[in-house]
């Protein structure tokens, strides 16, 4: 995957078929689970990639239906569709030709897994007029995952965390890094570092309130009001050696760093991690701005944190059933929130979705 449009495809492919062994710098091979902390569910499986989206995004049903048919003809054991309509989907495809393809898939024995969608709860979509006016259903799962002959997949959050992290107050906090070269990875700052967490959105005056304390430290600020590029540029201009944006809602952030002029590391943390930092750091105030200072440790390599839980919790983005046919949809729920897998350029990252 050498395009610049994102690395969702690489991430999903790594989950499905990531290699069992990875070549090392000396030419030897080592187990992926030991060196990269991840491998595919079906490691080393052959993967066919079928492009159905245009450069500007969006896919026609004729394109992905043709891809399903091609996969069946080629003898694929399974197919994955990381796509779906934003509005609640119907139970059957209205086009007889498409319905025939779906029925042929069932008879062929090929398993076709389709995302139930990332539309979340029904009420989250009402401002966008996605639910049909005449509908009394609270379903939000889109087509083709809503079709009778599809296998719709919903998402639960991972009970553990894998990836690069910072550590503070005895807690490993796994950050999300969506930046690319020439921006340095956060691991370039491995070891103990000072931080200044400005409890504001990252305007120039927000960082200025911390004065010289920010110089040579990692800057932290909250998501909101201004774009991610401005936050990072403002932090670097104030003397920060790296920037961390804390989410203002549950979940992770897939930040766009287009326009970021610095090379200093730029990553994001969850709201929950930000709250832990504020609760355990030294609190200060200047010019009407509250900020927190302390020292954290940047991990030099990926780590694992397995949390104790009696059960999984549904991902807040996962679409809900049930379609108009009253069939059990989606059929399967599996971990899709905060999954560690491939990133473009030979790296690894956490991403979330129902794919």
Segments the model singles out, each with a brief description of its role:
Residues 333-344:
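Active-site-adjacent bridging/hinge elements
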Residues 60-61, 66-73, 77, 87, ...:
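Hydrophobic, small-residue-rich alpha-helical packing segments that form membrane-like cores
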Residues 1-60, 74-77, 107-109, 146-150, ...:
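Subtilisin-like serine protease catalytic core
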Residues 28-36, 62-67, 135-139, 312:
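Alpha-helical scaffolding within the catalytic cores
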Residues 11, 76-86, 103-118, 240:
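Divalent metal-dependent hydrolysis catalytic cores, especially in the metallo-beta-lactamase
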Residues 54, 68-92, 115-116, 216-217, ...:
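Short acidic, glycine-rich surface-loop motifs adjacent to enzyme active sites
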Residues 2-5, 345-354:
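Short pre-catalytic strand/loop immediately N-terminal to key active-site residues, enriched for Gly-Thr
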Residues 1, 108-112, 116-330, 344:
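Structured lumen-facing ectodomains of secretory-pathway proteins
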